Each structure stands twice: as C-alpha cells, then as structure tokens.
Swiss-Prot record:
The keyword Protease does not apply. Component of the MICOS complex, a large protein complex of the mitochondrial inner membrane that plays crucial roles in the maintenance of crista junctions, inner membrane architecture, and formation of contact sites to the outer membrane. This is MICOS complex subunit MIC27. Belongs to the apolipoprotein O/MICOS complex subunit Mic27 family. The keyword Transmembrane applies. Keywords: Membrane, Mitochondrion, Mitochondrion inner membrane, Transmembrane, Transmembrane helix. Component of the mitochondrial contact site and cristae organizing system (MICOS) complex. It comes from Kluyveromyces lactis (strain ATCC 8585 / CBS 2359 / DSM 70799 / NBRC 1267 / NRRL Y-1140 / WM37). One of its GO terms (cellular component) is mitochondrial inner membrane.
Length: 240
C-alpha cells in the first residue's frame, strides 16, 4: 500500500475540524503555511512571493519614474512656450495699436493673398493640364503662353504666395512686420547669410532697380514736359 498523502492524522485535528495539510508541505521551507482565523489554510510559495514583490516594486518604480519624466517634460514645454510668447511680445508685437486693431484683419487678408498666389501660380489654371492641350484639339487647343510659363515655374510657385502674404502684413501692420524681419535676421538666420542677402538686396534693388526706375521716371517726366511745351507752341502758332 502506498504512502498516505496526508501522513499521520491525529484524532484531535479531525475533531477540531482543522484543515488537512499535505505531508510534503509540512516540513518544506519553500512553502509557508498559514491558518486563517476562519480555519482556512493558506499556502504561500516564498520564492514566488519574493519574485512577485520584486517585480511589483520594479513596476511601481518605473511607473513613478515615467510619470515624473512626463511631468518634467510638460513643465519644460510650458516654460518653452511661455518663453516664446514673451519673446514675441517683447520683440515683435510691440505696437499695441497694430496688435489690438489690425493684426486680425491683416492675418485674414494675408491668408487670402497666400491662397491667391497659390491659385495664380498653379499650372492647372494656365492650360498646362487642360484636356484641350493637345494637337488633336484643333482650334480649341490651349497653348500656355510665355508669361504663364514664367508665372508657374517652381521658384515662383514656392515664393509668390509668401511674398503676397508678407506684402499684406507690411502694408497693414508695418511696425510688426519690420520687427519680425529684424528678429529673424538677428536671432534666426546666420550672420553671413544676412550680410550676403543685404548686399545682394542693395545691389539689385537699391543700386539697380530703384535707380533705373527713378531714371525712367525722370525721363518720362522730361519727355512729358517737352511734349506739353511742344503742344502749347503748336496751339499758340495756330491761334496766331
């Protein structure tokens, strides 16, 4: 006959109704047995309990670390946003009248100008992708002009919407616009780029285009005066 699973059972255990504990658990140091007040017997594997507690502490530690890191990043982000807002208030939005009365209107018009520039410089609006743009269309054929090709090239498509939007801002909120340009030149763009772009602007616009326009304006004014003088002389001779 095989060995009894519960070993030797005392009569007083049976009489008291105490739980029966398997024999291999009684003297096993890896398993802790506890009897609850209601008589139930609880067996606790010590090694497993220690491992679970270790994992639990590690999970709690990682959770607290992640939460602390998230709060740190949130605080840093809030500080960064507040720093940016303060920078814009101190360096760009310094004209309170423009900010309070014109900035919203200027933004709406600038957005409209940006979309207008996008539409004007789109190839689809100049016949490049028209179904009639083929040799089989006959008299209905749409051939893009040189002006449309100039207006729809890649540099123009990339810059025209922004140029129009910037023009709106420069006309409706000139102080804010100039402050924004100064801040970009001072704190965003490299110094070499700013110097080169300023020199290029002076050569092309100030010393080139504006001088030619002034010369053309002066020539037109002189020619207009000469023409008026000639007309007056002609009228005076005819009257005599």
């Amino acid at each position: 006959m095989g060995r009894d699973f519960y070993g030797e059972i005392r009569d007083e255990v049976i009489k008291k109704g105490e739980p029966l504990v398997p024999e291999f658990i009684k003297n096993n140091s890896d398993i802790k047995t506890t009897t609850l007040p209601n008589g139930n017997s609880v067996m606790e594997p010590v090694a497993i309990t220690e491992w679970v507690n270790k994992v639990r502490r590690k999970v709690i530690h990682n959770k607290e670390y992640v939460e602390a890191e998230i709060e740190t990043q949130k605080s840093a982000a809030r500080n960064e946003v507040e720093t940016i807002k303060q920078y814009w208030r101190d360096n760009v939005f310094t004209d309170r009248k423009e900010v309070d009365e014109h900035i919203v209107t200027a933004s709406v018009f600038a957005l409209g100008a940006w979309f207008f520039g996008s539409v004007v410089s789109s190839k689809r609006n100049w016949g490049f992708q028209s179904p009639w743009n083929s040799d089989k269309s006959g008299i209905l054929k749409r051939t893009p002009s040189q002006f449309s090709k100039l207006l729809t090239n890649l540099p123009v498509r990339l810059t025209l919407p922004w140029i129009l939007a910037g023009t709106v801002y420069s006309q409706l909120t000139p102080n804010t616009w100039n402050n924004a340009l100064s801040a970009i030149k001072r704190d965003v763009l490299p110094k070499d780029v700013v110097e080169q772009s300023s020199a290029l602007y002076d050569d092309i616009i100030e010393k080139g285009l504006k001088i030619q326009l002034r010369s053309l304006n002066q020539s037109a004014h002189e020619n207009l005066q000469a023409s008026i003088c000639s007309i007056r002389e002609t009228i005076a001779e005819n009257v005599k």
